[in-house]
């Protein structure tokens, strides 16, 4: 089969020029389409359709098939359409047929086409317009209603052509007119039936289009509903986020208010403490005592701040400031990292003092502790030598107790501690060897120990009047509780006059 290689409009124009039948073969991918294509490729079919036929083959998935189905509904695949000059299908083959059957159909279509061409010779211009109608129908913007109106006009062409041919002859015999009108009547009856079939098909096609539009409208409504729900969900999420942010801001505001309240309470407490101090100062009689009380409060506060500052510095400091005290009373200071071992400090001391004290060790006095070899491997922070500490350099073979203190009392105490064992041994030996002289010695000791007594008694006698005067002076302004004196207040008199019973309740 010689298939036309161009587009459908070009094939229609070629069929119009040659006055041939326009054949459209719609094929798919199924087995019947393959069989029908084989029938079209048969030699008999090719020979039968060689003249007066312009055939084109289109695929069901192509755009050309979609345009063609808008004018000529494709009910099944494969399908073969034989379209005449008027645009009306002369024959439609649905499904697959054998090659012999296809040859028979082709001869039948050729006879119908020849019969149609004989009846339309008188009105060639109208036949050309009928052929041009399918060509225009394949444009994308044409509708099924326009094709239906064109088909109805084409169906009315044969009677008009017959009438004009009769008027043109003007004197021919009635028998000839009758013989020319008989094929015209048959051709009019056949297009009317084809028109009804096409109207039904177009009606079905319109219903299908309406159904498709309805489904598309439903799909659009579903999409709109999905978008609406999505928008609603986004709005809810946005509102929830706003509420969460509002709650977070309210919580932060509440925490800030609590912090401000705590700060205000602390300020009030401090003010109360200051008021109490001022009230206590007002009860003092002299300006010196008031200033002394304020100075004591200030010193206590400074001491407390100093303790806090030192504890904070001890926790935060990364540098240890070590003071090395030498046996001769001199000292030197150096800073070390708080995580450095004690051995580093000892090496620094050894480099500084040189061989003056030979092999020495390190110790602290408060608390009293002499560092061992294991301690030299520990960090200064672990040994509580950070952020600052005072370390004593002890020469080798010298105990910790033999360190020279700046105080003379500490020296005599240290000497007494060292010499006490020797004195005890000497007393035992002397008592054992010299048994007679002990009474004289004791008397001498008594007499030697008696002279200091008058001095001590005189000192105590001198101190008594001073102590009495101090007590008399304190009697009005201070209240004694054991060995502790405190300032008097207005409530002290009531407390002294009140009595207390056994269950700690006060009786007025």
From Swiss-Prot:
SUPFAM superfamilies: Thioredoxin-like, Ubiquitin-like
CDD domains linked: UBX_UBXN4 (cd16117)
Side Cytoplasmic, residues: 1-413, 435-508
Feature: compositional bias, Basic and acidic residues: 459-491
Chief place of localization: endoplasmic reticulum
InterPro entries, alphabetized: Thioredoxin-like_sf (IPR036249), Ubiquitin-like_domsf (IPR029071), UBX_dom (IPR001012)
Record's keyword annotation contains Heme: no
Any one GO biological process: ERAD pathway
GO CC terms: cytosol; endoplasmic reticulum membrane; nuclear envelope
Cross-referenced SMART domains: UBX
Domain UBX residue range list: 315-393
Organism per entry: Pongo abelii (Sumatran orangutan)
Compartments reported by the entry: Endoplasmic reticulum membrane; Nucleus envelope
Pfam families referenced in this protein's UniProt entry, alphabetically: UBX, UBX7_N
UniProt KW keywords: Endoplasmic reticulum, Membrane, Nucleus, Phosphoprotein, Unfolded protein response
Gene3D superfamilies: Glutaredoxin (3.40.30.10), Phosphatidylinositol 3-kinase Catalytic Subunit, Chain A, domain 1 (3.10.20.90)
Protein known as: UBX domain-containing protein 4
Modification Phosphothreonine, positions: 489
Region Interaction with UBQLN1: start-end pairs: 1-200
Residue ranges within the lipid bilayer that do not cross it: 414-434
Biased composition (Polar residues): 117-151, 160-187, 441-458, 498-508
Region span, Disordered: 117-196, 440-508
Quaternary structure and interacting proteins, as annotated: Directly interacts with VCP. Interacts with UBQLN1. Forms a complex with VCP and UBQLN1.
Comment text on domains: The UBX domain is required for interaction with VCP.
Record membrane topology: Peripheral membrane protein
């Amino acid at each position: 089969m010689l298939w036309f290689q161009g587009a459908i409009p070009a094939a229609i124009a070629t069929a119009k020029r040659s006055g041939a039948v326009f054949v459209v073969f719609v094929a798919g991918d199924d087995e019947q389409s393959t069989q029908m294509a084989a029938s079209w490729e048969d030699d008999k079919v090719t020979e039968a359709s060689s003249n007066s036929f312009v055939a084109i083959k289109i695929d069901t998935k192509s755009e050309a098939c979609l345009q063609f189905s808008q004018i000529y509904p494709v009910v099944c695949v494969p399908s073969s359409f034989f379209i005449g000059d008027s645009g009306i299908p002369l024959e439609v083959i649905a499904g697959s047929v054998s090659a012999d059957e296809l040859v028979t159909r082709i001869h039948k279509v050729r006879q119908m086409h020849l019969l149609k061409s004989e009846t339309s010779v008188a009105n060639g211009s109208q036949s050309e317009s009928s052929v041009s109608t399918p060509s225009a129908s394949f444009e994308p913007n044409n509708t099924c209603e326009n094709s239906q109106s064109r088909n109805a006009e084409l169906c009315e062409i044969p009677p008009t052509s017959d009438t004009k041919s009769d008027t043109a002859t003007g004197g021919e015999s009635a028998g000839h007119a009758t013989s020319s009108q008989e094929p015209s009547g048959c051709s009019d009856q056949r297009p009317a039936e084809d028109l009804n079939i096409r109207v039904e098909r177009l009606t079905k096609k319109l219903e299908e289009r309406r159904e498709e539009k309805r489904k598309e409208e439903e799909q659009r409504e579903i999409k709109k509903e999905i978008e609406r729900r999505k928008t609603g969900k986004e709005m809810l999420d946005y509102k929830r986020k706003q509420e969460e942010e509002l709650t977070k801001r309210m919580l932060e505001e509440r925490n800030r208010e609590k912090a401000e309240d705590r700060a205000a309470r602390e300020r009030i407490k401090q003010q109360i403490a200051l008021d109490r101090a001022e009230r206590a100062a007002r009860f003092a009689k002299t300006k010196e005592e008031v200033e002394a009380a304020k100075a004591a409060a200030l010193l206590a506060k400074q001491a407390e701040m100093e303790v806090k500052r030192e504890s904070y510095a001890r926790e935060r400091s990364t540098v240890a400031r070590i003071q090395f005290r030498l046996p001769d009373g001199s000292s030197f200071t150096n800073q070390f990292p708080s995580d450095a071992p004690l051995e580093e400090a000892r090496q620094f001391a050894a480099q500084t003092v040189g061989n003056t004290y030979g092999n020495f060790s390190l110790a602290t006095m408060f608390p009293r502790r002499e560092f061992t070899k294991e301690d030299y491997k520990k960090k200064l922070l672990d040994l509580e030598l950070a952020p600052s500490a005072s370390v004593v350099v002890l020469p080798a073979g010298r105990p910790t107790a033999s360190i020279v203190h700046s105080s003379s009392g500490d020296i005599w105490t240290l000497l007494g501690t060292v010499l006490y064992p020797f004195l005890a041994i000497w007393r035992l030996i002397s008592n054992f060897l010299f048994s007679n002289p002990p009474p004289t010695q004791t008397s001498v000791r008594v007499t030697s120990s008696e002279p200091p007594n008058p001095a001590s008694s005189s000192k105590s006698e001198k101190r008594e009047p001073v102590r009495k005067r101090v007590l008399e002076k304190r009697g009005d302004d201070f209240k004694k509780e054991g060995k502790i004196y405190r300032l008097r207040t207005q409530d002290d008199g009531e407390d002294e006059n009140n009595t207390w019973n056994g269950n700690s309740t006060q009786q007025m």
